[in-house]
């Protein structure tokens, strides 16, 4: 049996109701919570492991989560890539626009976006724009969207595969979660042929809609050649 255990971050029994009421935003920033709240999921995962259960330790969005997650000895760790890549692309676009124009309206848009995506809390509506710029810059730099490592949104996957290779958890696998979009599977497919990861293909699991995975059996020129074949079979020369 594999039991799914989520990271809880700053969410606890006292504030979880905030996610269900009003604007559904949390009043605590993701990085300003209590240690006991951050490690709630880790403790649960370890207890389950001690009782003989396998754990799928989920809600892993950033590479920095992986080292601590592996200490819980999970059967699965995760890389959430789809929404993360979209968010990174949007932040990078607004930050680039600000850096070219120094128009604070771009930072104001970033601030609203970061509140909506929980980089900032619901109480940060008037957060200093210099803080907003710093958070945006650090996010873009860490996720390496302007570099070969992360231009495809796969920086977290690369990191997690390296962590698995260098761990002593031979049974642990990486789930790449909820991929979709015209480039996500093709980019992951190319990543798995990179020489660095040729020994890790049996450590990765993909989760997605069957219809999305199935569409990657097709290509535009299949139609082109089927047209030729069918018309040739119909007697056309």
Q: How would you describe each model-predicted region?
A:
Residues 1-31:
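Active-site entrance/lid segments in N-terminal catalytic domains of soluble metabolic enzymes
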Residues 8-17, 84-85, 180-186, 211-214:
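Short acidic, S/G/P-rich loop/turn micro-motifs used as interaction or catalytic elements
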Residues 89-104, 193-194, 213-237:
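C-terminal helical cap(s) of enzyme catalytic domains, especially alpha/beta-barrels
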Residues 1, 197-198, 208-216:
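Conserved phosphate-chemistry cores used by DNA topoisomerases
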Residues 179-181, 206-209, 219-220, 236:
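Terminal-region recognition feature
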């Amino acid at each position: 049996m594999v039991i799914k255990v989520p990271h809880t971050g700053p969410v606890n029994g006292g504030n979880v109701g905030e996610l269900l009421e009003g604007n559904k935003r949390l009043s605590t920033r993701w990085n300003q919570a209590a240690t006991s709240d951050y490690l709630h999921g880790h403790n649960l995962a370890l207890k389950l492991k001690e009782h003989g259960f396998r754990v799928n330790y989920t809600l892993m969005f950033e590479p920095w989560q992986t080292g601590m997650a592996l200490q819980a000895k999970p059967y699965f760790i995760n890389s959430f890539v789809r929404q993360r890549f979209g968010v990174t692309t949007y932040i990078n676009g607004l930050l680039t626009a600000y850096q070219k124009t120094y128009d604070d309206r771009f930072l104001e848009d970033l601030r609203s976006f970061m509140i909506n995506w929980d980089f900032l809390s619901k109480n940060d509506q008037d957060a200093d724009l210099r803080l907003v710029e710093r958070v945006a810059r650090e996010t873009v730099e860490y996720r390496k969207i302007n570099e070969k490592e992360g231009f495809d949104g796969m920086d977290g996957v690369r990191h997690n595969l390296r962590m698995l290779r260098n761990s002593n958890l031979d049974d642990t696998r990486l789930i790449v979660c909820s991929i979709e979009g015209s480039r996500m599977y093709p980019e992951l497919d190319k990543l798995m042929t990179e020489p660095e990861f040729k020994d890790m293909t049996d450590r990765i699991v993909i989760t997605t809609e069957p219809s999305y995975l199935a569409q990657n059996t097709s290509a535009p020129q299949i139609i082109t050649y089927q047209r030729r074949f069918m018309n040739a079979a119909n007697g056309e020369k």
